Amino acid sequence: MAEAMAAPSAVIFDLGGVVLNSPFSAIADYETRNGIESNTINKVIGAAGEEGAFARAERGEISVHEFAEPFAHDCKLVGAPPLDGSALMSLILESCTPRPLMLEALGILRDSEIKTAALTNNFRSQAGDDRFTSALVDLQPLFDVIVQSAEEGVRKPDPRIYS
């Protein structure tokens, strides 16, 4: 007979696409609105790799306001059409809205005294643009700890972010 599984003492969540709406939806929306072939932006991000604008922004090396110029460079490198990195980043940040069912689940876990953590790839804002920061402030009471790639200088899937 199978042994009963013990209740967890802690649960780790990603934010984008789990607790918050997915940034991938915002990327797809940007492509659709601008008549860009589907998956173009993901190809640019992938081809640029760890030295590309997106990876650098997620490590906090450049802010959301500094993203547009290096992203345009990444687009040129892979032969993609010119893309408005500022508009793209705005859509991504606007997509950072909570998923009500996940907020409810987090509340249940907290009420059950189960530790909760968030591990997220995010971006460093600058004064006057606190959309993602505001989302984090609103979520803070639901987590014992939030680990942010832009603060740690390392992003998922790099194993160092897990230690």
Please place each PLM-identified region on the residue numbering.
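Generic signature of intrinsically disordered, low-complexity, basic-rich segments
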Residues: M1-A2, L101, V145-I146
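Short, flexible, glycine/charge-rich loop motifs used to bind or transfer phosphoryl groups or to couple energy/partner
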Residues: M1-E3, L106-G107, S134-D138
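N-terminal helical cap/lid subdomain that shapes the substrate entry/recognition surface
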Residues: A4-E104, D111-S112, F123-S125
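Structured helix-beta-strand junction loops
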Residues: S112-E113, L142
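Short beta-strand/turn micro-motifs composed of small residues
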Residues: T120
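Substrate-recognition "cap/lid" segment bordering the active-site pocket of phosphatases
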Residues: R124-S163
